[in-house]
C-alpha cells in the first residue's frame, strides 16, 4: 500500500509540492467577495433591431439585472481618430489623462454591472498600451472590475 503524503501549507515563498495543498492562508488575506442572493432577472423591453447606439456610461434604456452577457471592447487611450474627433465637443467625456480614462472605464463598467443579471458575465477585450515598457491596461481593468466593482475573475485569454 502506498504511503500517504502529508498535506502542505502555504509558506512565505511558495511550496515545492501541490498534493493536498492547503492554500486557505493565502486566500484568507483577500477580502471575500459579496455574492448576491438575489436571483431576480428583469425583462428587457423591445429593442427593435436588437442594437442600441449610445454612451455605455448611460444605459437607462436597460433595466437593472436584465442582461446575461456584456461583451465590450472599450476605446484605447492612445490618441486614435475617434478620440480627436470628439475632443473639441463640450461634454464629450473624452479623458485627457490616463487616470481620467480609468475613471471613464469605471463608469462604463459600473453601468454594465448594473444591468447584469445575477450570475451574468462580462467579457472585456483590451490590450496593453505601448511597447517595452508598456502599461498593463488589463491589470487596471481587472482591478476596476474585481476590487472596485466586486466581480469575480473567471479567466483571462
Model-derived regions: residue spans:
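Core catalytic lobe of class I
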Residues: 1-157
Amino acid at each position: 500500500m502506498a504511503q500517504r503524503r502529508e498535506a502542505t501549507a502555504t509558506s512565505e515563498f511558495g511550496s515545492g509540492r501541490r498534493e493536498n495543498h492547503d492554500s486557505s492562508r493565502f486566500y484568507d488575506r483577500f477580502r471575500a467577495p459579496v455574492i448576491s442572493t438575489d436571483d431576480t432577472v428583469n425583462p428587457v423591453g423591445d429593442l427593435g433591431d436588437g442594437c442600441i447606439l449610445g454612451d455605455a456610461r448611460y444605459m437607462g434604456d436597460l433595466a437593472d439585472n436584465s442582461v446575461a452577457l456584456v461583451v465590450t471592447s472599450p476605446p484605447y487611450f492612445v490618441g486614435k481618430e475617434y478620440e480627436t474627433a470628439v475632443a473639441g465637443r463640450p461634454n464629450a467625456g473624452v479623458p485627457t489623462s490616463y487616470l481620467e480614462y480609468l475613471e471613464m472605464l469605471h463608469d462604463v463598467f459600473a453601468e454594465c454591472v448594473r444591468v447584469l443579471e445575477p450570475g451574468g458575465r462580462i467579457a472585456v477585450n483590451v490590450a496593453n498600451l505601448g511597447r517595452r515598457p508598456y502599461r498593463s491596461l488589463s491589470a487596471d481593468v481587472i482591478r476596476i472590475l474585481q476590487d472596485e466593482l466586486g466581480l469575480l475573475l473567471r479567466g483571462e485569454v
